[in-house]
């Protein structure tokens, strides 16, 4: 069977008239409130009847007639007597009453026996024990749906602790779904029942002492309003309390007496204000109210009047659809007979299929006769009255408009002065240098002060900074109370706690936190002994003195071996005149003692040498030395940068395990801080051992403030356990402090608020906005960077100063001085052994210096100062070997004419190395020094003459 659907605006015409009365459709309404000014139920029924009868589409002459009966009291006897008066009139349905649960039960039972439809408009009572008749339909939303809606709101606000105030014992049954939700989630829900005095003051005081911020009130509208007024007298109507009223008419109450409009008051409503007739309906009730009840202002239509209006339309719509399929007739019934209405069951089936939009929203019933597929509007109290911020639908659940809810809170924050509790702690909050000359918030500066300014600019609120009385962050006492800033928030003495307040699970149970504005962890701060700073000769540090000594010995050993090997191998001896092979008996060896010492130096300095080894043995020595120098130079270069730039630190511990495994270094944390709580509650074995040590150590290793802990670190063998942000701050300002290891945990700093504060979401959004704009990072850099110590994580190349590499300049200067001194000695030595002249040594020195200063040509005559040595006695010719010449060093040199060669060599005294085996032979071979006599074959006169000419061709 298709569902019956009809618009409420234009009701279709009747197709068939009822048999017993072709001109009327009779409905009975029972009202239990005879005062018209109280609810307007009589007027609403009249408005519905007249609107239906005036419908232009109505066909025929049938009209709707509503007979109204009044109950003076909630009496079963009076109710039964009234029903016996209604049944003989031949009604198609009975409406009401709007209250009186006992009367409603009697009416439902009688209608069920006679199979006459009954519409209930009152809240259901005794859900567990009341039997719902098939003929009974309830237009009022069920308490089960309301309890589910309340649970959804609590879940939306993340509420884990609440209190339920019941006006009657039946509320525990009516709100069973809500209680079951708390049982499943294991959250805390305390239930308090009003006593017979109906005075809610004692209950409210208990709730205030328990610090419960969310209060659910299940009572009628008048009692709910009374409870709210009493709460205002006790100071419980503020921004830290949330009230949820289950009564659907609470939004009609006047809130003029509320002083603090920041309180979060939520209620429900099912009025469909978008209905075309709603405004006319409300105006009609208002006009009637003004005529009959001018002593009380009109606040809005009562829910029962709107439900009765919709009930009339639902009955007419169902009768219309039933007449489409069959002709129905209504006959009088009697309480004294067992006769029933034969069309009652059919009409009930059509009533259960009705779907229409009424003054109370969508009207539809389920198989149990309860209203379904409708929505409860969620209202929030504002400065301008109640405003819808969401809805709860039977099928779709809760849907909240967070934007509207947040805007209401923003309006509440606008121009509101919040009390901020805080604590003096660098760099979060500090007194200015001239704070005595200032007052109010201007006395303070720091990270938290700047952050408060940013938040106040975004949320448009005012604030007053106040230092916490006991100077601590907050720890629980043995009696359950809290100290410090946490205690002030619990006592509602402050609105915000802005400081380095750590978010912990224990604190989260008693106060609310915003999202963290800074992430950190526990770290270890310790004093270090700085090693020796890089000095002038720090370029020698990459190698130890022993290595330098062994390198010197290796150099001398290689030089000696090279000199020995070069002398032994015949391949290092060669003719200085390769173009005159066979005609010159001179052999030259380039590895003199000086060259043997110079060649390793060139290889070690990676500059090379003009001396190249010829023999395989000398090349082997050279290759081994080069490989040795390659490794040495590479190792030196790799370590040089570190030794020139890094100032090594002497730290006896490197991790938290090292700290826990020793007893020489004391360690502790701030007493009453979150770090102390962390070690106290930790289950990690290492941290448990550390807590046992700190707890039992005497004298105490706990400190009262961060400054005291820093002073103890600097003045004694003490390691301080504190947050990493404070660690970084003090390390930036004292280079003797360092962090040991990494973080022991991860946590955050948040803004503390009293439980239930409606401002938390607003501050969360503001903090996220500051983080996205990088404002918090900018503020941290402003207050953390001290500039005294470089960042440890900065690995960029840094310029070296004279204190790092000054020693190499000293070596260079000393080398230059030694070279100048040696040049002077060589100059004097040459003058002493030159041919004698009349010029003195000093004059020669002055002349040479003048030519150096004037940059004259590098050509001057040979110096002669020393007396000419007497000629050597001629060697007897019979003692001279034929075809050889004797040099001054005793070596023999072959020549064509011995006398001429000897005379030539005597004249070229500068070319003869006295006491040595070397001599320069020709211009092309000036580098060849070693001369060695070898057997000379018989030569012709032409060969000897050519050699003579060749050896005598060297210029002066």
From Swiss-Prot:
Stretches that traverse the bilayer: 546-566, 624-644, 805-825
Localization per record: Cell membrane; Postsynaptic cell membrane; Presynaptic cell membrane
Residues bearing attached sugar chains per UniProt: 158, 220, 272, 286, 323, 408, 415, 479, 736
SMART domains with a match to the protein in the record: Lig_chan-Glu_bd, PBPe
Superkingdom of the organism of origin: Eukaryota
Single GO cellular component term: presynaptic membrane
Keyword terms: Cell membrane, Cell projection, Glycoprotein, Ion channel, Ion transport, Ligand-gated ion channel, Membrane, Postsynaptic cell membrane, Receptor, Signal, Synapse, Transmembrane, Transmembrane helix, Transport
CDD domains the UniProt entry points to: PBP1_iGluR_Kainate_KA1_2, PBP2_iGluR_kainate_KA1
Segments on the Extracellular face: 21-545, 645-804
Entry's Gene Ontology BP terms: modulation of chemical synaptic transmission; synaptic transmission, glutamatergic
SUPFAM superfamilies: Periplasmic binding protein-like I (SSF53822), Periplasmic binding protein-like II (SSF53850)
Gene Ontology molecular function terms on file: kainate selective glutamate receptor activity; transmitter-gated monoatomic ion channel activity involved in regulation of postsynaptic membrane potential
Signal peptide (from-to): 1-20
Membrane topology: Multi-pass membrane protein
Region (Disordered): 863-889, 931-956
InterPro entries recorded: ANF_lig-bd_rcpt, Glu/Gly-bd, Iono_Glu_rcpt_met, Ionotropic_Glu_rcpt, Iontro_rcpt_C, Peripla_BP_I
Record's keyword annotation contains Iron: no
Subunit structure: Homodimer. Can form functional heteromeric receptors with GRIK1, GRIK2 and GRIK3.
Family recorded in the similarity comment: Belongs to the glutamate-gated ion channel (TC 1.A.10.1) family. GRIK4 subfamily.
Protein name as catalogued: Glutamate receptor ionotropic, kainate 4
Organism: Pan troglodytes
Originating gene: GRIK4
């Amino acid at each position: 069977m298709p569902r019956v659907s009809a618009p409420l605006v234009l009701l279709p015409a009747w197709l068939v008239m009822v048999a017993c009365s072709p001109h009327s459709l009779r409905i009975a309404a029972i009202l239990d409130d005879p005062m018209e000014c109280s609810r307007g139920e009589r007027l609403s029924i009249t408005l519905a009847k007249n609107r239906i009868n005036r419908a232009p589409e109505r066909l025929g002459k049938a009209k709707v007639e509503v007979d109204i009966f009044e109950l003076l009291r909630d009496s079963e006897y009076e109710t039964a007597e009234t029903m016996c008066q209604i049944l003989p009139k031949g009604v198609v349905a009975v409406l009401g009453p709007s209250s009186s649960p006992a009367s409603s039960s009697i009416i439902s039972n009688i209608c069920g026996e006679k199979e006459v439809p009954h519409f209930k408009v009152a809240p259901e009572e005794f859900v567990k024990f009341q039997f719902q008749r098939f003929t009974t339909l309830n237009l009022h939303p069920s308490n089960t749906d309301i309890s589910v809606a309340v649970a959804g709101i609590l879940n939306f606000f993340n509420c884990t602790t609440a209190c339920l105030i019941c006006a009657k014992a039946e509320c525990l049954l009516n709100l069973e779904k809500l209680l079951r939700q708390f049982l499943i989630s294991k959250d805390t829900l305390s239930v308090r029942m009003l006593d017979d005095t109906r005075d809610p003051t004692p209950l409210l005081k208990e709730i205030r002492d328990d610090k419960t911020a969310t209060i659910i009130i299940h009572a009628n509208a008048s009692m709910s309003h009374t409870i709210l007024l009493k709460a205002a007298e006790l100071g419980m109507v503020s921004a830290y309390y949330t009230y949820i009223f289950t009564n659907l008419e609470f939004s009609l109450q006047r809130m003029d007496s509320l002083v603090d409009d920041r309180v979060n008051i939520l209620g429900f409503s099912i009025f469909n204000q978008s209905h075309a007739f709603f405004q006319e309906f409300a105006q009609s009730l208002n006009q009637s109210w003004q005529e009959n009840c001018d002593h009380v202002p009109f606040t809005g239509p009562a829910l029962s009047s709107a439900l009765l209006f919709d009930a009339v339309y639902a009955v007419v719509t169902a009768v219309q659809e039933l007449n489409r399929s069959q002709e129905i007739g209504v006959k009088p019934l009697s309480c004294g007979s067992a006769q029933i209405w034969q069309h009652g069951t059919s009409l009930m089936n059509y009533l259960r299929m009705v779907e229409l939009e009424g003054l109370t929203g969508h009207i539809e019933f389920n198989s149990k006769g309860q209203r379904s597929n409708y929505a409860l509007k969620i209202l929030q109290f504002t400065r301008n009255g109640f405003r819808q911020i969401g809805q709860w639908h039977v099928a779709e659940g809760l849907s909240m408009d967070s934007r509207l809810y947040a805007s209401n809170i923003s309006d509440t924050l606008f121009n509101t002065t919040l009390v901020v509790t805080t604590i003096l702690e660098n760099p979060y909050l500090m007194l200015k240098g001239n704070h005595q000359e200032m007052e109010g918030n201007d006395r303070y500066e720091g990270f938290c002060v700047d952050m408060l300014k940013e938040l106040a600019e975004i949320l448009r609120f005012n604030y007053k900074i106040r230092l916490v009385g006991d100077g601590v962050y907050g720890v629980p006492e043995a009696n359950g109370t809290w100290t410090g800033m946490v205690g002030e928030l619990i006592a509602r003495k402050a609105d915000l706690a802005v400081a380095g307040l750590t978010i912990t699970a224990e604190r989260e149970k008693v106060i609310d936190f915003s999202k963290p504005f800074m992430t950190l962890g526990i770290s270890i701060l310790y004093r270090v002994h700085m090693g020796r700073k890089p000095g002038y000769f720090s370029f020698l540090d990459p190698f130890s003195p022993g290595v330098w000594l062994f390198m010197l010995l290796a150099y001398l050993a290689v030089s000696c071996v090279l000199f020995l090997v070069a002398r032994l191998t015949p391949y290092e001896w060669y003719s200085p005149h390769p173009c005159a092979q066979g005609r010159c008996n001179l052999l030259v060896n380039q590895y003199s003692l000086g060259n043997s010492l110079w060649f390793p130096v060139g290889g070690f300095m990676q500059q090379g040498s003009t001396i190249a080894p010829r023999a395989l043995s000398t090349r082997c020595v050279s290759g081994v030395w080069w490989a040795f120098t390659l490794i040495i130079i590479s190792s030196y270069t790799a370590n040089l940068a570190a030794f020139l730039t890094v100032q090594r630190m002497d730290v006896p511990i490197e991790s938290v395990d090292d700290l826990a495994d020793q007893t020489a270094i004391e360690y502790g944390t701030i007493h009453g801080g979150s770090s102390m709580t962390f070690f106290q509650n930790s289950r990690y074995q290492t941290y448990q051992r550390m807590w046992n040590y700190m707890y039992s150590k005497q004298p105490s290793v706990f400190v009262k403030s961060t400054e005291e802990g820093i002073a103890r670190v600097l003045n004694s063998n003490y390691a301080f356990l504190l947050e990493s942000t404070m660690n970084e701050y003090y390390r930036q300002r004292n280079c003797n402090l360092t962090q040991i290891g990494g973080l022991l945990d991860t946590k955050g700093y948040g803004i503390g608020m009293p439980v239930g504060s409606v401002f938390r979401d607003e501050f969360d959004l503001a903090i996220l906005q500051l983080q996205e704009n990088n404002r918090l990072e900018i503020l941290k850099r402003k207050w953390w960077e001290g500039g005294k110590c470089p960042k440890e994580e900065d690995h960029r190349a840094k310029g070296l100063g004279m204190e790092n590499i000054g020693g190499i300049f000293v070596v260079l200067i000393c080398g230059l001085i030694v070279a100048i001194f040696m040049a002077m000695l060589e100059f004097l030595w040459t003058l002493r052994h030159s041919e004698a002249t009349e010029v003195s040594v000093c004059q020669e020195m002055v002349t040479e210096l003048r030519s150096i200063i004037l940059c004259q040509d590098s050509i001057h005559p040979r110096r002669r100062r020393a007396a000419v040595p007497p000629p050597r006695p001629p060697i007897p010719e019979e003692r001279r070997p034929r075809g050889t010449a004797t040099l001054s060093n005793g070596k023999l040199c072959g020549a064509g004419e011995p006398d001429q060669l000897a005379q030539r060599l005597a004249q070229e005294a500068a070319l003869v190395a006295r006491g040595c085996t070397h001599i320069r032979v020709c211009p092309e071979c000036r580098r060849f020094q070693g001369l060695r006599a070898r057997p000379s074959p018989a030569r012709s006169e032409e060969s000897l003459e050519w050699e003579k000419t060749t050896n005598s061709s060297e210029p002066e």
